[in-house]
A protein has these predicted regions:
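Short alpha-helical donor nucleotide-sugar binding micro-motif in glycosyltransferases
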Residues: 118, 249-250, 257-263
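Donor nucleotide-sugar binding/catalytic pocket of nucleotide-sugar-dependent glycosyltransferases
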Residues: 119-167
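A short helix/loop element that forms part of the nucleotide-sugar donor recognition site in Leloir-type
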Residues: 160-176, 231
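Conserved donor-binding/catalytic core segment of Leloir-type glycosyltransferases
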Residues: 175-193, 199-202, 215
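Glycosyltransferase donor-sugar binding loop
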Residues: 213-229, 249
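Nucleotide-activated donor-binding/catalytic signature segment of Leloir-type glycosyltransferases, i.e.
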Residues: 228-250, 314-319
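Acidic donor-binding loop of glycosyltransferase active sites
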Residues: 258-275
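A charged, aromatic-enriched C-terminal amphipathic alpha-helix characteristic of glycosyltransferases
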Residues: 320-363
Length: 363
């Protein structure tokens, strides 16, 4: 006789290896739903050494719903395990909630590996109407768009009460004291964020005598793309190699916001425009520094996310019209420095309550 599952939801993850933004989201979402319904959630760690077939079978059987987030960087070489977990969930008649954070911005090989997950999922949660349309327009996967629901994405990190000193922060502070213009970019560095575009803007600022220092607070995502090599080659081509810093992985929120405090303005020139899935933008806004971003491609991009829309309406996020050339971004950066700081109070728990309720509604 089959016993009732002990948990409402089983969250698949990679344990301490989940250092990417999606991995952090997976952990915080589990915590958020657990706050709504204490004792309702369990986790299953899937890595090269954790998560045997027997472990997966038992864990899947313990919950009514299985929740899986893609893409988690540390799963790139162990993708079979989460897919096996979803297949076992289907065999055991568990409901599968797939949270798909992006689509067209992924390398085509990664999209192919996710096709089985799209097929197995009962519901696909997405955070952006644009990304949902990307899925709908995909010739191989467009059929899965009918399973999609939208949820509001919260920030992964909240500004702490204090900041941490670091050598990099001291370097940035010293640069500002020397009259340099420190332009920031926060988050993982990969092709979908067009990291080289900011280099072009930096070169324009340099030609104008603004003495820019471009700091990328984050690390490169290593994959089949040669994004890091191409980035450094482009910086050298523009004569910007000595004007660019890449921090690498930053371990604590206190250190992240310490670096934020030494930035004059953030800039994100995005081919796809601003979307409601950009949690890195939400982190930057909390610094009170200007955040300059390409405007959204879709007029309804933020209809499902009133908190994000409010940040734009209040001027915390400065939009640049799509199709603008790099000179316009440079102009916005310089002009934004003259505006008063926009300090927006962040109800971190409220943001996470919104997404926890939206996902829990799919159980």
């Amino acid at each position: 006789m089959n016993s009732e599952p002990a948990y409402q939801a089983l969250f698949l993850g990679a344990g301490p290896q989940m250092q990417c933004g999606v991995g952090q989201f997976a952990r915080l979402l589990c915590e958020g739903i657990e706050k709504l319904d204490p004792g309702s959630c369990a986790t299953l760690t899937l890595t090269r050494s954790d998560g045997s077939a027997a472990d997966i079978w038992r864990a899947v059987g313990s919950a009514r719903n299985v929740v899986c987030n893609f893409p988690i960087v540390s799963w790139k070489r162990v993708i079979f395990r989460p897919l096996l977990a979803l297949a076992m969930a289907r065999l055991r008649r568990r409901r599968i909630i797939l949270i798909q954070h992006e689509w067209a911005g992924l390398h085509w090989l990664r999209r192919v590996t996710y096709l089985p997950a799209l097929w197995l999922a009962d519901t696909i949660v997405m955070f952006s109407p644009l990304v949902r349309r990307e899925l709908a327009d995909d010739r191989l996967a467009g059929w899965a768009a009918r399973k999609c629901v939208l949820a509001p994405l919260p920030p992964n990190i909240v500004a702490p009460a204090g900041i941490a000193e670091s050598r990099l922060r001291q370097r940035l502070v010293a640069a500002r004291e020397e009259g340099r213009l420190v332009v920031g970019h926060f988050g993982s560095i990969y092709p979908g964020k067009q990291p080289n575009a900011l280099l072009n803007i930096g070169a324009i600022l340099k030609a104008r005598g603004q003495k820019p220092l471009i700091v990328y607070i984050g690390s490169f995502i290593r994959g089949v793309d040669k994004v890091e090599q191409e980035f450094h080659a482009r910086a050298a081509e523009l004569g910007m190699s000595d004007d660019v810093i890449v921090s690498g992985y930053v371990a604590s929120d206190h250190e992240v916001f310490g670096l934020f405090s030494a930035v004059d303005a953030f800039c994100y020139p995005l081919d796809e425009g601003l979307t409601a899935r950009r949690s890195s933008i939400l982190a930057c806004v909390q610094s009170g520094r200007p955040v300059i971003v390409t405007g959204p491609a879709e007029p309804d991009e933020f209809n499902h996310h009133p908190r994000f829309k409010e940040l734009i309406d209040r001027g915390a996020i400065v939009l640049v019209a799509r199709g603008s050339d790099d000179d316009v971004y440079a102009d916005k950066i310089v002009s934004a420095l003259k505006w008063p700081s926009v300090q927006v109070p962040f109800d971190f728990d409220g943001w996470w309550l919104d997404v926890a309720q939206a996902v829990k509604a799919q159980f």
